[in-house]
């Protein structure tokens, strides 16, 4: 069995919801699509049948993947966390030393990261640089554009909305 990994309780619920949907809705729909395509006769030249079989393979692979993820997840209720230093689950406000603009990041598990929502994976370069830091600390992060420097302004632990 592979190692456990952290995930927020909201992130875990989202994965479980997707898993249930795949098992109880998509799996049934794909089976119906295959049966309907079979009814059209010759399977060797049946594009609908091939498409349905491909979708079935995708759905089954995704179910297996999600079952593996949920079995290895270490669920963390971020709202119950606290502390003065940055760790998994923190919502961090930083000041970019160059532009003096505020940026905010939520440090989450790898399966719930979404940069468009400012959620960064615990394994990302920015999160790795931030872990263990406190308010007032200066953090240097290697980015594709070079080294960026930030000052930690606030650290909070609160539930995220997914």
From Swiss-Prot:
One Pfam family of this chain: GreA_GreB
Coiled coil: 44-69
Keyword annotations of the record: Coiled coil, DNA-binding, Transcription, Transcription regulation
Gene3D superfamilies linked: Transcription elongation factor, GreA/GreB, C-terminal domain, Transcription elongation factor, GreA/GreB, N-terminal domain
SUPFAM superfamilies: FKBP-like (SSF54534), GreA transcript cleavage protein, N-terminal domain (SSF46557)
GO MF, one example: RNA polymerase binding
BP term (GO), one: DNA-templated transcription elongation
Listed InterPro entries: GreA/GreB_C_sf, TF_GreA/GreB_CS, Tscrpt_elong_fac_GreA, Tscrpt_elong_fac_GreA/B, Tscrpt_elong_fac_GreA/B_C, Tscrpt_elong_fac_GreA/B_fam, Tscrpt_elong_fac_GreA/B_N, Tscrpt_elong_fac_GreA/B_N_sf
Family statement drawn from the similarity comment of this UniProt entry: Belongs to the GreA/GreB family.
Biological function: Necessary for efficient RNA polymerase transcription elongation past template-encoded arresting sites. The arresting sites in DNA have the property of trapping a certain fraction of elongating RNA polymerases that pass through, resulting in locked ternary complexes. Cleavage of the nascent transcript by cleavage factors such as GreA or GreB allows the resumption of elongation from the new 3'terminus. GreA releases sequences of 2 to 3 nucleotides.
HAMAP family: GreA_GreB (MF_00105)
Name of the protein this chain belongs to: Transcription elongation factor GreA
Natural source organism: Rickettsia bellii (strain RML369-C)
Phylogenetic classification of the source organism: Bacteria, Pseudomonadati, Pseudomonadota, Alphaproteobacteria, Rickettsiales
